[in-house]
Amino acid sequence: MGYCSGRCTLIFICGMQLVCVLERQIFDFLGYQWAPILANFVHIIIVILGLFGTIQYRPRYVTGYAVWLVLWVTWNVFVICFYLEAGDLSKETDLILTFNISMHRSWWMENGPGCMVTSVTPAPDWAPEDHRYITVSGCFLDYQYIEVAHSSLQIVLALAGFIYACYVVRCITEEEDSFDFIGGFDSYGYQGPQKTSHLQLQPMYMSK
C-alpha cells in the first residue's frame, strides 16, 4: 500500500514538473533566454523518462531522473543568485542567460503585472540598432522576483521528486530481490523426497 501511494505521488510530482516547466519554457522563449530554454528542454526529456520508469517499474530510469534533479536544483539556485545579483553577478550587465548573443532580458521585465513601458529617444550610442531603449515603471512586482519565484517552485518540486524517486527505487529493488528469492514462477514441479528401500541379499542354498 505504501509503495503504491509513493509511486502515485511521484507520478503526480512529475506531472506538476512538466506543467510548470512548460509554462516557464513559453516565457523564456518570448524573452529569448537561450540558456534557460536549453536547460528546460533537457529537464522535460528527463522528467518524461522518469515518469516512464515510474509507470513501467524501471528503476534505472527513475535513478537517472533522481540524479538529474540534483543538477536541476543547482541550476535553479544559480538562476536565483543571478537575478538577486549575489556575489559578482549582475542581471543588468551579464548576458549569461542569452549566451552573450543578444541583449534581451526576461519577458517579465516589460510584461510584468502593472508594468508601464516608455521608449527613450534618442537611444544611447552603445545601444544596438535593432534594439529599442526603454524604461519600465509602475510594476507591482519586479521581474527578478517573478523569475526567483519560478526557480524556487522548481527547487521545491525537485526536492520532493528526489525524495520520492529514491523511495520508489528502493521499493522496486526490494520487490525484485524478494521475488527472485521466492522463485514464484518456477516451472519445475515439486518432487518430495522419495523413500529408498534397502534390500539385504542373503545367499540361498539348494539341496540336491
UniProtKB/Swiss-Prot annotation:
Claim: Oxidoreductase is one of the keywords in the record: no
| Topology term for the membrane | Multi-pass membrane protein
Source organism, top-level taxon: Eukaryota
InterPro entries for this protein: Na/K-Atpase_Interacting (IPR008516)
Q: Which UniProt keywords apply?
A: Cell membrane, Membrane, Transmembrane, Transmembrane helix
Is-annotated flag, keyword rRNA-binding? no
Tissue specificity of this protein: Detected in the brain only and specifically in neurons; expressed in multiple regions such as cerebral cortex, thalamus, cerebellum, olfactory bulb and brainstem, but not in the hippocampus.
Q: Which residues cross the membrane?
A: 1-23, 35-55, 64-84, 148-168
The terms describing its cellular component in GO are: plasma membrane
Under Pfam families, the record lists: NKAIN
Compartments where found: Cell membrane
Please give the subunit comment from the record. Answer: Interacts with ATP1B1.
Which family does the record claim for this protein?
A: Belongs to the NKAIN family.
Q: What is this protein called?
A: Sodium/potassium-transporting ATPase subunit beta-1-interacting protein 2
Can you name the source organism?
Mus musculus
Q: Which gene name belongs to this protein? A: Nkain2
